[in-house]
Curated annotation (Swiss-Prot):
Gene Ontology cellular-component annotations: host cell membrane; membrane; virion component
Induction info: Expressed in the late phase of the viral replicative cycle.
Cell compartments where the protein resides: Host membrane; Virion
Keyword set includes Transmembrane helix: yes
Record's bilayer topology term: Single-pass membrane protein
Protein name: Uncharacterized protein CP123L
Presence of keyword Transmembrane helix: yes
Region Disordered, annotated ranges: 33-54
Record key words, sorted: Host membrane, Late protein, Membrane, Transmembrane, Transmembrane helix, Virion
Coiled coil (UniProt feature): none
Family, as annotated: Belongs to the asfivirus CP123L family.
Domain of life per record: Viruses
């Protein structure tokens, strides 16, 4: 039986031959002997997003002409109603609120105020 040193040398030679064979097949795959295939190019950056244009969007939508004409006015009215509701909520008397909203799921006046403000932040 061969010694351990001989086995190590044989194993090293076989390993080197395997690596050389692998390198040979890699270069033949590239159809140019001795040259490795070119590296993969970096990914191209995504195209820049177009800035949102509300007027262009409104032209493309299939809304009724009255809606297209009045949507800004209605949005301003809704914003005014919301802001006046916030002011009204801040000035509302706590006892009157609790008397009117008993059993509606509000724990306290502050709880209702915080829920309403969370709703306004979302929308």
């Amino acid at each position: 039986m061969p010694s351990t040193g001989t086995l190590v040398i044989i194993f090293a030679i076989v390993l080197i031959l395997c690596i050389m064979l692998l390198f040979f097949y890699k270069t033949v795959e590239a159809e140019k002997p001795g040259v490795l295939p070119p590296p993969i190019p970096p990914p191209t950056p995504p195209p820049s997003k177009k800035k949102y244009d509300h007027n262009e969007y409104m032209e493309k939508t299939d809304l009724e002409p009255e809606v297209k004409k009045n949507h800004r006015k209605w949005a301003n009215e809704a914003e005014h109603l919301i802001s006046s509701s916030v002011k009204g909520l801040e000035n509302l008397d706590e006892t009157a609120f609790l008397a009117n909203h008993k059993g509606h799921g509000f724990r306290t006046f502050e709880h209702a105020k915080s829920l309403f403000k969370e709703f306004l932040k979302k929308y």
